Amino acid sequence: MENHVVELVQPRHTLIGENSILEIPQFLHRLEGTVTALVVTDQGLVKIGTVKKVTDVLDRAGIRYWTYDGVQPNPSVGVVNKAMEQYTRQGCNCIIAIGGGSPIDVAKAVSILAANGGRIEDYCGVRKSARPGVPIVAVNTTAGTGSEVTCAYVITDEVKNVKMVMMDPNCLAYLAINDPTLMVGMPPSLTAATGMDALTHAVEAYTCREATPYTDALAIEAIRLVGRALRRAGADGCDMQ
């Protein structure tokens, strides 16, 4: 009989709950040396004030940071390179991603490059990096991809016009945060789309060949919660229940 080994990889710390972003400084202060963070996000989240909610926390704690807000949906190699240039130029030693899958994916790419060097194209595939990436705080703002807790990221090679998929435990977040106060007020269409994305991921997890009793329990509960809450959340984006 073939031995079947299950490996579970997760962020070192995960916070879920209202105002959990207030805990970011205490986790950053646990890191070695003086923290200089690169905040990776997109201009839309800057304009609606979501990023300011997080950077206000950093300001009050006296944490030094720089912001890269050039992330676009389906982020490209060029975007990763620009973020990496700013990370290096400002002498950063950790990353705070604010957003959904795209900013978090860029943060993962920069994390791997900062620790391992080379080009992001070198890491396409499974477990291609030799060293753990620099610490990432992944602040999620949508309910869709789950990128804040996974070891996968996708970057578009705009030259070859292909999406590169990376699977690498070395890019896992140091701290993942799901703070619902950052998600209130989203347009109903975005709430619906990301909610259906979450439901799809849960169904996929339950029906895939690599499912385990552990993942089944999480998937079934996710399906139940989305089914109960999605219509309410779409009708009232400020409904915390």
Sequence positions of predicted segments:
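N-terminal amphipathic/basic leader segments beginning at the initiator methionine
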Residues: 1-31
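Solvent-exposed alpha-helices and their adjacent loops that cap or buttress functional pockets
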Residues: 6-8, 31-32, 88-90, 126-132, ...
